[in-house]
């Protein structure tokens, strides 16, 4: 599920971002990370990441659920290709996409969706809720953040089997929206991180979390949204995330009314 925008010679957003230049995460060191999988034939396939935000709600990217598929969420996973013994499998009962999301215009923003699970997961040391930032919270430039996911480990590469993490310091809006970076493609409802040309998200990381260290604890400040169509790890084209703090009231309203 690779969504391409325009030609590869232009710096246009490409959704489905995966971790490039990362390392294998410690087993269950990011216990709010989930794998969003769809059924095709008799098999299940990882398509996106997500964050467990309630025992029966997951936050992901809207572009991950643009297609009518039968989805399930796997919590507590580390190696997608084997049984770790810690996984919890739950079907997705309802999908709520942000009403302003337009799949033909990723750069407009609103790339966020909430998934209500058919039943609540059990919280333990392998499965925990992600901590969300306060509404309107803005990261300082160069804040320490990690992207996590099972996405491709290089442009046009293979999906990772074990959860990967990469250190991606945040890039503030003033820099990220400058002409030598993303320009007007990036909006102030987005978070940019990385851009060193080595480490980035890539296809398959989409929808997953950007964990940032603020006041001594990690919270999920981003939902992985897009990278450059020229490649995942392009210098001065940081990975772009939906800014979670811009959607806190929407998230709370959706959960309260569903």
From Swiss-Prot:
Ca(2+) binds at residues 77, 79, 82, 87. Residues 9-18 form a propeptide. Binds 1 Ca(2+) ion per subunit. Residues 19-256 form the Peptidase S1 domain. Disulfide bonds join 48-64, 145-212, 176-192, 202-232. Basal layers of epidermis (at protein level). Not expressed in the pancreas. The active site is at 63 (charge relay system), 111 (charge relay system), 206 (charge relay system). Its main location: secreted. It catalyses: Hydrolysis of proteins, including elastin. Preferential cleavage: Ala-|-Xaa. GO terms for molecular function: metal ion binding; serine-type endopeptidase activity. Keywords: Calcium, Disulfide bond, Glycoprotein, Hydrolase, Metal-binding, Protease, Secreted, Serine protease, Signal, Zymogen. Residues 1-8 form the signal peptide. GO terms for biological process: elastin catabolic process; exocrine pancreas development; inflammatory response; multicellular organism growth; negative regulation of transcription by RNA polymerase II; pancreas morphogenesis; positive regulation of angiogenesis; positive regulation of transcription by RNA polymerase II. It is found in: Secreted. The keyword Phosphoprotein does not apply. Glycans are attached at residues 79, 233. It is an enzyme of class 3 (hydrolase). Its EC number is 3.4.21.36. Serine proteases that hydrolyze many proteins in addition to elastin. This is Chymotrypsin-like elastase family member 1. It comes from Homo sapiens (Human). The lineage of its organism: Eukaryota, Metazoa, Chordata, Craniata, Vertebrata.
